[in-house]
Structures are given as structure tokens and as C-alpha cells.
Amino acid sequence: MKRTALKIGYIGTNFHGFQRQPDLRTVEEELIYHLRKLGYIDDLKKSRFRIAGRTDAGVHSLGNVISFQSEKEVRVNEINNSLPDDIQILAKAPVRFGFKPRYAEMRQYRYVLFRSDLDLYKLNEVAEIFKGTHNFTNFTKRFQKTTTRTIDDIKITKANLNDYHKKEFPNLHDTLSPVFVDIYGESFLWNMVRKMMRVFVDVAIGKLSLEKVEELLNPAENDPRANIKVLDPDYLILMDIKYDGVKFVYDDYACERFKRNLVDSLGDLQRKYAIRESMIKSLEDLERIN
């Protein structure tokens, strides 16, 4: 019996999070159903089915990881042919029997900011403050044994839109120029990235000082937890998870297939955008008539 790790891509908008929930569509439920259907797993305990990260509803992924044991040789495209278009296996790796995907060497999250009023210099300043080891108790909703985490790196870049996006959504991209915030670390608390992004935005628009950020990362023992509102999950992507000694091999056909699925979903978004744009235009015409 061999143990295999799989790297998963999915469109989070279509799921109620990763973890199984009664009567709700989740990524984990879809994966288990199709792996069972194809004969890769049966009993979850015997197959030692494990997951790396429980992303919230709306959060997307290009790199979440699951692992399991199976007598059957794992064939990526056989699984993808069974899975729905909004979730696909992108890569696989053989792993040791005791491998647990939650214990990663590095995780990379990307948050995409769509605001024209952001000061990029201030964004980079606040990024420098967050790098390193801190007490993130103010950046999670749950009480945990330890809230100390280390941010290895944060990269902030203006997005380069390719010709396809410019052609399909010309009006949209005339007004919105997204900023990518890529955050790297071994592990993250629940809601930590989205709360961090709220602070990033507040600093970049002049609503919050860098001194206050320092205070949030160095709370006194008896300080009440700060009420930091999370930013929307729809703009967060789990980009990658890496492990010491584990080499994932990406399947070219699987990656191309998922890319096509994403392009197809863009077409649907374009139609929805056009409908809303036509409704706005009609209302503006009414205002001129009146």
C-alpha cells in the first residue's frame, strides 16, 4: 500500500469551505466522494486520509494538499475526469507512511487588493513590521494554545494584466489595478491573513498608524483582544504548500485543463458584468430623461 500526496486547485466561491459540513457542498466532501467512487479509498481511517488546510468558504486554492494510502496506483487525470470542473488535482508526490500534510515547511497565501487609494510605500512599510516572529493573538478569532507565528516574507506587487483579461474586461481594468500581497510562513492562525489584510489596507489609506500596528503585534498579557474585521475571503488564494523532502510533479494536462475551466468561468463572469453594466446604463438614461 502506497501513500500519496495530491495538490488541489479549486474555485472557492462555489464551496462552503474545505472541511466537511452536513448538507453543504465542500471541497473535502467532493474529494472523498470521488476517491471512493474510483476505488482509491474506502474507510477514511484505514486510508489515513489527511488534509493540509481548512480554507474558509470563498477562499480559492492552487496548492492545498491532501494525502491518503491506497492499493491502487493514483492516476491524476482519472480523478480529474470524475471531479467537477471547479476542483481539480494539479500535482502528486509519493510520501512516507507517517506524512501529515498539516505540518508544512512553508505556506504561501496571496490576497488581491482592488483599490485605487492604496499607498504602496505604506503597504511595504507595514509588511516590514509583520515580518518575523510575533504574537498574533489580535489576528485570530479563536483562543489557541499558542498564537506565536513567524512570517518569513511578504511581497507586494502591482498585477500585470495579460492581453486576454484586457480584451475581455476593458472597462473593468481601466478603473481597477489590483495589488498582490503574497505572504509566506510555516503556519497561520484561523482568519490571520484576512485580519492582516485589514490592517494593511487601513495603514495604506491613512486610517491606522504604524505605531498602532506595532502595538497590535505586541499585546500586553491582560489586553483585550482587538476587534479587527476580516476582509472578504473571495480575494484570498492559497497559492502553495511546500514540505521538506517532498517533490510534487505537476501534471501538464491537468494544469491546462484547470486553466481552461478558469477561462470558461471568466466568460460567465463577463456575461454577468455585461448585464449589470447594461442595468446601470439604463438607470442613467432614466435619470437623464427625468
Swiss-Prot record:
Record keywords: Isomerase, tRNA processing
EC annotation from Swiss-Prot or TrEMBL: 5.4.99.12
One Pfam assignment: PseudoU_synth_1
Keyword hit for Glycosyltransferase: no
Record GO terms (molecular function): RNA binding; tRNA pseudouridine(38-40) synthase activity
Gene3D superfamilies cross-referenced by the UniProt entry: Pseudouridine synthase I, catalytic domain, C-terminal subdomain, Pseudouridine synthase I, catalytic domain, N-terminal subdomain
GO aspect biological process, one term: tRNA pseudouridine synthesis
Residues annotated as catalytic: 56 (nucleophile)
InterPro entries in alphabetical order: PsdUridine_synth_cat_dom_sf, PsdUridine_synth_TruA, PsdUridine_synth_TruA_a/b_dom, PsdUridine_synth_TruA_C, TruA/RsuA/RluB/E/F_N
List of residues binding substrate: 109
Class of the enzyme per the UniProt entry, highest EC level: isomerase
Catalytic activity: uridine(38/39/40) in tRNA = pseudouridine(38/39/40) in tRNA
Family of this protein: Belongs to the tRNA pseudouridine synthase TruA family.
HAMAP family: TruA (MF_00171)
Record function comment: Formation of pseudouridine at positions 38, 39 and 40 in the anticodon stem and loop of transfer RNAs.
Protein name: tRNA pseudouridine synthase A
Organism: Methanobrevibacter smithii (strain ATCC 35061 / DSM 861 / OCM 144 / PS)
Source species taxonomy: Archaea, Methanobacteriati, Methanobacteriota, Methanomada group, Methanobacteria
Gene encoding the protein: truA
